[in-house]
Amino acid sequence: MLLPDWLNALILGLVEGLTEFLPVSSTGHLILVGELLKFNDDRGKLFEVVIQSGAILAVCWEYRRKLVELLFGLGHSRQARRFVLNLIIAFLPAGIVGFLAGKAIKAHLFNSTTVTTTFILGGLIILWVERRQRPPRVESIDDVDWRLALKLGLFQTLAMIPGTSRSGATIIGGLLLGLSRRAATEFSFFLAIPTLFIATAYDLYKTGGILHAEDLSAFGIGFAAAFVSAFLAVRGLLRYIGGHDFTAFAWYRIAFGLVVLSTAHYGLVAWTG
């Protein structure tokens, strides 16, 4: 499907923003939509890096007051220092695994079998977790200690497997560890900031030479679309979990996994990295 670059940018920006912070795997959706739009060459891969920056900025904007409090509280607030330290601890496992094995994971696991399996298995795990859900022991992200942060970071490493979903791994991991839905979701949002920022900066460093002046307008549209849609998705998810569980996302993952299986079987989408 050949569309103008600005329209490709708008569509992919919306897809990135709407899926980045939901437990559904933005990567899987971007592969599918990028393939359908025929926007999956090196420019397309660079574009994914740019729109991810828009999604990161959206969650920073949503929590701007908390981030400012943390920044100015580091010098005198023990709670601020503890929270930032917990984010660093939670980031380290994925950072180390990504540095040591990121290329190997992309080379060997980025295929339709892996993506299908992780989508469907992830959905089944969410259903299981929600059915066994017990009263939470941790109601606020400020009550997360370094041990919990480390365990949440270990859950985040699972997102290195294509189709798993970084948000899904950390949110469901949080529920298993006794966090409330809101605490698990908000910690996942905050953990996304250093994780996605560093990953995006690294990818941009590797691919930045491909960016040309004629791409700037389309990339700007995609960035803006990702920012707005991610902001709405974050706000919407926080409202949604106030009265619902994650079961709907589980069934969506299972259905999408079947879509991946079908498109791969009939050769409609090249599910490779």
Curated annotation (Swiss-Prot):
Similarity section: Belongs to the UppP family.
GO molecular function: undecaprenyl-diphosphatase activity
GO CC list: plasma membrane
Function: Catalyzes the dephosphorylation of undecaprenyl diphosphate (UPP). Confers resistance to bacitracin.
HAMAP family cross-referenced by the UniProt entry: Undec_diphosphatase
Protein name per UniProt: Undecaprenyl-diphosphatase
Residue intervals passing through the bilayer: 46-63, 83-103, 109-129, 184-204, 218-238, 249-269
Organism taxonomic ancestry: Bacteria, Pseudomonadati, Pseudomonadota, Gammaproteobacteria, Methylococcales
Any coiled-coil regions, as ranges: none
One Pfam family this sequence matches: BacA
